[in-house]
Amino acid sequence: MSKTNQNLTIDKVIDNNNNIYLLKLLMIGGDVCSKNGISMVEKFLKHDKNLIQVFDDYDSTDEYINFKMKLNEFSSIDTSNSINNGIIYSENNKNKNNNNNYNYNNNNYNNNNNNNNNNNNNNNNNNNNNNNNNNSNFKIQIQIKDLSDCYCDLKIQTIPSCFYRGIHGFIIVYDINDHIAYNNIPKWIEEINSFSMKNSKIIVVCNDSNSKTPNFSDSSSSSSSSSSSNIIPLNKNTKNKVVGGVGVDPILANKLFQSLSIPHFIVSVDTNENIKMAFNSLKTLIFENNPLFQFFKLQGDDNNNNNNNNNNNNNNNNNNNNNNNNNNNNLNYLNNLNNLNNLNNENNINNNSLNNNNNNNNNNNNNNNNNNNNNNNNNNNNNNNNNNNNNNNNNTYNNDLKTNKKSLEIKKHNSNIEKKEVKQNIKDKKNKNKNKNACTCNLM
């Protein structure tokens, strides 16, 4: 019998403004427990933290075990931008009034430029946070109903058909020493195909706690082992007869399920071997082949594309603002250079070295403009270049001010020397006049 024509639906709940979609799994088959009586689901969810890395939180009530996880198919953007809040101030606070005004303008220039860069970086961080918030709104809550060992053998027909409806994935389990549960698997598959809905997936899990996972590539050893022992391979004509000491050949079982295109896993509830792989395999099958989950994935990708387009538009606007700021900064820079030239002229400082510095600064401004044009496609790089340009301008200002201060100190020193010489000459003349007057008095 084929599966029902009804399509699978996904129930949606709202929790803290997040859309949570319910993914339902049903576990059926024989009794699969560890030596301590712990079921495979409990072992997977509760007793090994290494096996629940993909899950946020979970709770268990009676036969239901629920846990939440983020739908990891949605890509997320996590970009951290380094923000340079450092502002370089001039140390020449003891200069004349003109020099202090020059420092004040220079500090305002740096403050404005750094504030603009910080605003642009904050805009980028806000856009990235919006992307992460949009992605986190899509979550999947997985609901597992464990009916293994509740309905087996003659009671298999007593399971109501409503148990199969709305189930996205089925886990058929059996123990390697329980040939009855193994031989009932064809009935379970037939039941699932009869009552389940489209796009539902099946995996078969065998619990083998006595030995390690066999090598399925060794086909020769499997035929010899099956002939030398009372192992019953699975087929639809096998009768459910209890045979003492009979087990299941996992290699033959694996070949059979491969022919049915059903994934088959050998796990160990005692050692946790392959348990995580089995659950994740079923989750992947459902996500990759179910058009409903593909729709949510595409919807999430569209949201990310829209957010990226908005980020690009914001980056372009930020680049335009940066260009305007750079133009204003260049004008302020030229005005500051003119103030420095006037100050040097008033103090009779040689203008040749200062003019050379101005030419170098003009070249730096041209390079800054080229860098700004090249960095329009990347706002973060543009902000970093602006900070570097500010540092270069500050260094140039400081060098010019140091030169000016040194020249003023030299002039002041020379002036003091000249004053001392003049005072000494006046003192010498007075001494000579006193000596002359003394000589005249003696002669009289």
Curated annotation (Swiss-Prot):
Chain coiled-coil ranges: none
Q: Where is this motif: Effector region?
A: 51-58
What GO CC terms are in its UniProt record?
A: membrane; plasma membrane
- What keywords is this UniProt entry annotated with? Cell membrane, GTP-binding, Lipoprotein, Membrane, Methylation, Nucleotide-binding, Palmitate, Prenylation
Bilayer topology annotation? Lipid-anchor
Which sites bind GTP? 29-36, 73-77, 207-210
Gene Ontology terms, MF aspect? GTP binding; GTPase activity
Q: Which residues form the propeptide?
A: 442-444
Region listing for Disordered, in residue ranges: 91-136, 213-232, 298-401
Q: Name one Pfam family in it.
A: Ras
**Lipidated sites in chain (S-geranylgeranyl cysteine):** 441
Query: What is the protein name given in its UniProt record?
Result: Ras-related protein RabX
**Where does this protein come from, organism-wise?**
Dictyostelium discoideum
